[in-house]
Amino acid sequence: GISKKIIEKRKKEILKVSNLFKFKKTFQLKLPANRLDTISLDVLIKKIKKICDQVKPELIFLPFEKDIHTDHFNVSRATQACIKSFRNPYIKKALAYEIISETNFNFMKGEKFKAQTFFDISKFLKMKIKICEIYKSEISKHPFPRSILSIKSLAKLRGSQSGFKAAEAFQ
């Protein structure tokens, strides 16, 4: 697990980011960080489903299913269980995102992340970097994967693959 001090620090970081984006609402599920494998998948499904029913999103972003991080894997599985179109007709599309420090670190055989959908973030890259810098508990110096240089480099790579100056990729 993660220490209470780090959890409190992350809560403050999330609040700063939420304020910067001017989100109307954020949801704190109060589940054990880095320990979602210790709770029933059903518990996670119910919590995510409750939010989906409340928000009724048309577009869902979820972690890539083969992400090496156990929490990301469990969130992806639970979210997929929640977003079946026959139960949630308001959901039009779901896209899996890549997480620079986790998605491509699965060295086992199996499905790898395939960049299939790109969003142009050229106008927002500076803002993305500013937001990433708020997450001091997650960012470190290069060559750490979650460095500012790595984040910019991935955005430029995805941009070059899609005809933009900078992009984010989804599957």
Where do the protein language model's features map onto the residues?
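Short histidine/acidic/glycine/proline-rich micro-motifs that form metal-
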Residues: G1-K4, P32-D37, E65-T70, K136-K141
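Active-site adenylate/phosphate-handling loop in enzymes that bind or generate adenylated species
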Residues: K47-K93
